[in-house]
């Protein structure tokens, strides 16, 4: 049985940064839109930050549009409610080009259909070949 793309992405993330932060995978079938992970990330300043993380695997279309097959509007609604309450959340989107997009939760409604040539301000890209400190710094910078 083959793994789903998001499962493989989770396994990569856990191997890439798991020893440098706290990651808890959430398997919630009750709360609509609850993200896939809860993480606590230590910044270079020594301050820990808690962030909810939605994992997605996506492909760029030939027109340069991001296609996220498992995108659900109620997930974006969750991020919007969480942001209004003062929380921080992100989307980590693995693309077919070997990059990971780090998208602030405030842009959750724009994830599916995002244009590569006109990324919204605040979206960061990191290579899957990056080391843990670089990945964590990019996550915390969003």
Where are these regions (language model features)?
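Acidic-basic catalytic patches of nuclease active cores, encompassing PD-(D/E)XK
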Residues: 1-29, 42
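Beta-rich catalytic cores
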Residues: 33
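Conserved catalytic cores of phosphodiester-cleaving nucleases, focusing on short active-site segments
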Residues: 37-39, 46-60
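A generic structural motif
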Residues: 40-42, 94
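Mg2+/Mn2+-dependent nuclease catalytic core
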Residues: 58-78, 82
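Nucleic-acid nuclease catalytic cores
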Residues: 80-110
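Short, electropositive alpha-helical surface patch
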Residues: 101-128
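Charged phosphate-binding loop/patch that engages nucleotide di/tri-phosphates or the phosphate backbone
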Residues: 120-142
């Amino acid at each position: 049985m083959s793994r789903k793309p998001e499962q493989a992405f989770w396994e990569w993330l856990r191997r890439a940064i798991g020893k440098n932060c706290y990651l808890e995978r959430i398997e919630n079938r009750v709360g609509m839109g609850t993200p896939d992970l809860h993480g606590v990330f230590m910044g270079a300043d020594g301050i820990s930050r808690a962030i909810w993380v939605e994992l997605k695997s996506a492909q760029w279309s030939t027109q340069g549009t991001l296609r996220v097959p498992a995108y659900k509007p109620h997930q974006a609604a969750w991020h919007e409610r969480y942001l209004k309450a003062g929380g921080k959340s992100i989307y980590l989107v693995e693309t077919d080009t070997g990059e990971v997009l780090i998208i602030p939760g405030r842009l959750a409604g724009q994830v599916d259909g995002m244009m590569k040539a006109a990324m919204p301000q605040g979206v960061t890209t990191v290579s899957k070949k990056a080391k843990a400190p670089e990945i964590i710094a990019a996550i915390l910078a969003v």
